[in-house]
Amino acid sequence: MGYLVRKADAFLREWKKNPDRKPLIIKGARQVGKTETIRTFARENYKNVIEINFITEPSYKVIVEEGFSAEHIIKLISRIDPTKHFEENETLIFFDEIQDFPEIATALKFFKENGKYDVICSGSLLGVQYQRIASISVGYKTDYQMYSMDFEEFLWAKGYSEEAISDMLCHMLEGVAFSEAEQVIFSNLFLEYCILGGMPAIVSSYIERETFEGSLDLQHQLLVDYENDIVKYAQGLDKAKILSVYRSIPAQLAKENKKFQYSKVSKGGRSKDYMGCVEWLKDAGLINVCECLQFPELPLKGNVDESKYKVYISDTGILVASLDDESQIDLRANKNLGIYKGALYENFVAEALVKQGYGLYYYSKDNSTLEEDFFIRSANELIPVEVKANTNRAKSMRQLIKSDTYTDIKHGIKLMAGNVGISENIVTFPYFCTFLLKRYMGKQNLFQ
């Protein structure tokens, strides 16, 4: 199928409208769609596009040998390939896979000062060495974090209009349940998205074929590619330990207590044995880390128990690819999430919150039954968010709302495989509405 519309498209258009725009660095994990998005934008907006990939074209690493000025770099690019034409104010220079040549970031200052050519850089695993890139280009670049497709982008790919999405938000704002037909349709679409994840190549293949056939092979290959990246780029750390941590995540999430435990990585494993591994995976964009609050109250920063956290895979489709063969067959044949239902729903919600710009926080105490899956905040409140694989009553949430101790909590949000509803101070939304939470929070009156 053709190009899949992405939210990054609108960001790129706004970036180009800015007369004082800086060179742009687009970060994101492998295969989230960075290169195709940039290429499409470039074709539609520039007369000349100079694309250099530092993995497939390592010969271009010499372009800084005479210095980092825009003039020197343009001259050497032209010497390597005289067919590349540089026309002032009509040319985009696209440096791809810069994780293999972070030195190019030094040139961004000089391209900004030159002002005659637009520059976009992109790469995977940039977070791993981003301090270095950031320090040599501070003040002369704009950063943009790109993720795999969220559920809204999946709906666009399936042909759904902005009108349909606006109608979903109206149901949330007005507290009106979806019709039975709508509920079934959107729930089925949501299950498709959960099984596939948001990697554009996988989504595109599924829509073209109208079947899950082949999707698991693509997911498995991506999982292999991620693990190969760990081996290639994990410098200064024990690569085997990082791999072990990454491979343990599905089992960690399958536990009733989803707190990350190093004893589940290896027998007798301790946090000091795996120092830096979780941080590396987070910086690489492969996982999302949910921090445990010491107390369910504001502020969030400075209120974290650093010894406790949960770890989620950054794309739920990659988590699905890690499941056992029997579950894979059942998922694709019957859309049955089985014993992994709780893990997949929770991973999806974590992923959706991150893609909306929220930090991840939860609450749990070893000597208490009081616990919450996630928290988000409004202007005046801390809002607990519960992920319910079944229809239980959210006892912890009600206890927090009624508590005289935790006065920052007055309302709650429950996400489940049900319909829209309001009961006392708790609003309930179906999982397929999760991507709209930030817009809901910005427009509703309940939490103001």
Predicted features along the sequence, with ranges:
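N-terminal pre-Walker A segment at the start of P-loop NTPase domains
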Residues: 1-17
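Conserved lysine of the Walker
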Residues: 34
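Hydrophobic positions on the alpha1 helix immediately C-terminal to the Walker A/P-loop
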Residues: 37, 41
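Short glycine-rich substrate-engagement loop in P-loop NTPases that contacts/grips substrate
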Residues: 56-89
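Structural recognition of the conserved hydrophobic beta-strand(s) that form the central parallel beta-sheet
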Residues: 94, 118-124, 145
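Interdomain motor-coupling "hinge/lid" segment immediately C-terminal to the ATP-binding subdomain
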Residues: 131-254
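Accessory nucleic acid-recognition modules appended to NTPase machines
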Residues: 204-371, 375-379
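Catalytic cores of nucleic-acid endonucleases
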Residues: 389-429
